[in-house]
Amino acid sequence: MVDPVPEEEKAGAEPGDSGGDEAVASVPPDSQGAQEPAASSASASASAAVPRKAEVPCAAAEGGRREQSPLLHLDLFNFDCPEAEGSRYVLTSPRSLEACARCAVKPVELLPRALADLVREAPGRSMRVATGLYEAYEAERRAKLQQCRAERERIMREEKRRLFTPLSPAAAAAAAAAAASAPSAGSSSSCSSASLPASPAPRAARKASPSPSSARTQPPPAGSRTGRKSHSLDSLSRRREGALSSESGASSSSYSGESLRELRWPPRASARNSCPAGSASSTTNAPGRPSALTLVPITGRSFSLGDLSHSPQTAQHVERIVRQVRAERGLRGVPERDRKIAALMLARHQEELLLLEQRAAAHGQWELQRVHAKQRREREEREKQRALEQGRRAWAAQVEERRGRRGREEREAARRRQRQYERSEERRRELAERQGLLRRERAERAAREDRLRKLQQEQNLKQREEGLQEGRERAEQIRRERAQRAARAKQRQEGQLQREKRELSRAERARHEALLQGRTRQQRQEREGLRSSLEASLGRAQENYEHLVEQRTRELRERARREELQGRRAKEAAERKEREHQAHLEALARAGERRLQHATQVAEEAVQQKARRVGQSRLEKERAQRANKEKVERDEDCRRRELLQAIGRKLERSEQLTRERRSALESARSTARASFHVREKVREETNTRSFDRMVREAQLHASLDRK
């Protein structure tokens, strides 16, 4: 997490000058125990410290700022706040990395590993051997963690002692000599005095290729940080009580020194986020091996640009440059804002010199750590091979023991199976005998049942044949009787058909005669023609017909009478309705005439009243128009006089502003010339590179790395 910093403070940084005291370690929750750490220092500093040209901070907001450095800061204690709980990103303190470097321990070796990872690395191991290796690894990891925590406490005590103890003159002279030798060493290389030397990683990679185990532990190369974050002395003194909280950062760091040695140093890269670390070993520092703090006395202190730019030496240096510019150019005083910019430029130059010293010490320490790491890897490989051989022998002994036990169990099982087989054979023979007896009994019983069934079937067959014979005889007799009845019925039908044909012919003749003589005579002839078969029914039908005819005649007469009565009533109703309609129309005509007369009278009255109102409104409008015209003329006169007065005031104000602007422009030009000469003087003394030059150097380094 990053402290919020105003834009004015961010604008005061030159490219590559935001120093870093923190490294960000990304530890995913599902990859605890993995040997490949995530890329560090990529999320906190890469986005916060982008190189850009210097922008002057606002002098008016200078009084309300914090007492810390004006640059962007990383908070060493922000993982104690509630907002950081459950975050995947943990800030790793540089003290933790320094403690790991002193103890020759890689921070990734302090991470816990799962038992499944050890089993996955060596599929041939048994679970007992893997469990033993896991317990040994955990014990070694806890010992290393305790050792690194103790070393970190010792580093914190040394830093506190240095913070409150001024440097001796001898130490100051040694630091100045180292600062003087660093630029000369840097200028002999292909880059400028402020650029970094190339890392010896390619040479180390050509000397010894990594073993399979070490290749697994090497993390992917982390992206170089574009800026440096410095923890100010004031913030450190205020928060020294909560320094113990960074132990979690040491245990969750994903830092690896070998991955950084495999990269070339980009220009102005941080020296704090590339602290060397050894491989997995719990040995402490050798008595003759120098640490980073013993090589360079100043590396134990944590500086920021705010600390360097507010120091008395920087203030005296800036004052001397200002006096020199006044004497040479004869200009007026330099503003406080430009003085702060000059002090910041000098502080950056001092910080670069300090970082050069730290890098030189780190490169020497890295070379020594590489040799020790190679020896430790070889020793660990031998120990792993020895443990693997022991595991194989134990596994072979267990296999032999299991094989003998399995043979005994198989022989015992064979004997049990033999006894069971013999018992089953006896039971099978007894069962076979019983089944044979049962089969013979069933066969005899089935034979008896078959004989009885055959006898019964023969009897049933005889009875069925006799029944069939009787049925055939009865059927033949019935068929003959049916044929006789059919013949008689056919004869009767033929006689009936002939009679019907004769009757039909007579009926046709009678119908033809009835058409000529009339319906009454036709009905009488039909009754005479059908009297042989329908005499009784025809009489009733005739009676019914006569009754129906009479009833129909009566109904027709009644209906005709009702229709005539309804016709007379409808005619009377129509005449009455016509008379009523005629009277209604006459009444409507009279009412319409009355309404028309009333409407004509009302319209005439409305026209007269409207004419009177129009005349009155015209007179009122004429009076209002004359009053408005007089008012507009008066307003125009007032506005014209006010406009003339305002134009006069504006002309006077414009002349005054022109005079003030001319004087302010002259003053600003004089101040700008003084500020320019002060900055040029500071650049000449510090030989600071420009942003374009840094871009060209970065492109050159990138092309050399690709080659």
Curated annotation (Swiss-Prot):
The gene is CCDC177. The modification Phosphoserine is found at S311. Residues 38-49, 183-215, 243-258, 665-675 have a biased composition (Low complexity). Residues 377-392, 399-426, 454-484, 491-514, 543-581, 618-637, 652-664, 677-707 have a biased composition (Basic and acidic residues). Pfam families: DUF4659. InterPro entries: DUF4659. This is Coiled-coil domain-containing protein 177. Residues 1-65, 183-294, 372-426, 454-581, 597-637, 652-707 are annotated as: Disordered.
